[in-house]
């Protein structure tokens, strides 16, 4: 059975977000097309996603020195345990669907924190004499991103840092089979916002058949 992580990073629901509306349409279509698969929703705004901070570095230092989990402070244990849960869930999945808005040329900070939780040496990638090698080969990902302007092509494509960073990190851990759906231009062309949304939903439903 294929396991799909539906990873969202938006404080708004589908009623208040173009991207979430497209994401929900995709995942519902996917469930209809693949009823045997397991879909797990991860709302990053309602999930414990520790940032790499002094506590995490201190915990990693203790592990490197040969100390065990019991040597960590209570706060360090809580953060490491949450990070390990996020990592194990990510490693055990076969498909990833990220739904994010663009905020100031990137995605919400919690997405970066989540990627820091799951891009871990020895777990999702390893270092070799020929360079780093991803360990999650054979998996697939989709990124659905909503932007007020147009960033998928043209002069502003170079500053679509969220899309580029996510694709880079996924490739680094071995997930090179990626798809992208742009839900874009709603603020630049407000009179076409509904049309843009409906076109993206149609695209998402079609992609769900072969994802």
Swiss-Prot record:
Family listed: Belongs to the azoreductase type 1 family.
Assembly mode: Homodimer.
Protein name (Swiss-Prot/TrEMBL): FMN-dependent NADH:quinone oxidoreductase 2
* InterPro entries, A to Z: Flavodoxin_fold (IPR003680), Flavoprotein-like_sf (IPR029039), FMN-dep_NADH:Q_OxRdtase_AzoR1 (IPR050104), NADH:quinone_OxRdtase_FMN_depd (IPR023048)
Taxonomic source organism = Bacillus cereus (strain ATCC 14579 / DSM 31 / CCUG 7414 / JCM 2152 / NBRC 15305 / NCIMB 9373 / NCTC 2599 / NRRL B-3711)
Q: Which UniProt keywords apply?
A: Flavoprotein, FMN, NAD, Oxidoreductase
Highest taxon in the source lineage: Bacteria
Cofactors required: FMN
EC number(s) given by UniProt: 1.6.5.-, 1.7.1.17
UniProt-annotated binding residues for FMN? 102-105
Q: What does this protein do?
A: Quinone reductase that provides resistance to thiol-specific stress caused by electrophilic quinones.
The reaction(s) annotated as catalysed by this protein in its Swiss-Prot or TrEMBL entry are:
2 a quinone + NADH + H(+) = 2 a 1,4-benzosemiquinone + NAD(+); N,N-dimethyl-1,4-phenylenediamine + anthranilate + 2 NAD(+) = 2-(4-dimethylaminophenyl)diazenylbenzoate + 2 NADH + 2 H(+)
Under the GO molecular function aspect, what terms does this record hold? Answer: electron transfer activity; FMN binding; oxidoreductase activity, acting on NAD(P)H as acceptor; oxidoreductase activity, acting on NAD(P)H, quinone or similar compound as acceptor
């Amino acid at each position: 059975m294929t396991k799909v992580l539906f990873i969202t990073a938006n404080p708004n629901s589908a009623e208040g977000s173009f991207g979430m509306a497209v994401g929900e349409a995709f995942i519902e279509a996917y469930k209809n097309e693949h009823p045997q698969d397991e879909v797990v929703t991860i709302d990053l705004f309602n999930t414990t996603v520790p940032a790499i901070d002094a506590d995490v570095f201190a915990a990693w230092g203790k592990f490197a020195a040969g100390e065990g989990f019991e040597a960590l402070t209570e706060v360090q244990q809580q953060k490491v345990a949450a990070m390990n849960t996020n990592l194990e869930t990510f490693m055990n999945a076969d498909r990833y669907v990220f739904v994010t808005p663009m905020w100031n040329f990137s995605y919400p900070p919690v997405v970066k924190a989540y990627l820091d939780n799951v891009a871990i040496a020895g777990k999702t990638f390893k270092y070799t004499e020929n360079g780093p090698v991803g360990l999650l080969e054979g998996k697939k990902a989709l990124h659905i991103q909503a932007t007020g302007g147009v960033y998928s092509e043209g002069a502003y494509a170079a500053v679509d840092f969220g899309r580029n960073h996510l694709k880079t990190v996924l490739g680094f851990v071995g997930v090179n089979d990626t798809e992208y759906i742009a839900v874009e231009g709603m603020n630049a062309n407000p009179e076409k916002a509904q049309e843009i949304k409906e076109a993206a939903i149609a695209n998402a439903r079609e992609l769900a058949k072969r994802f």
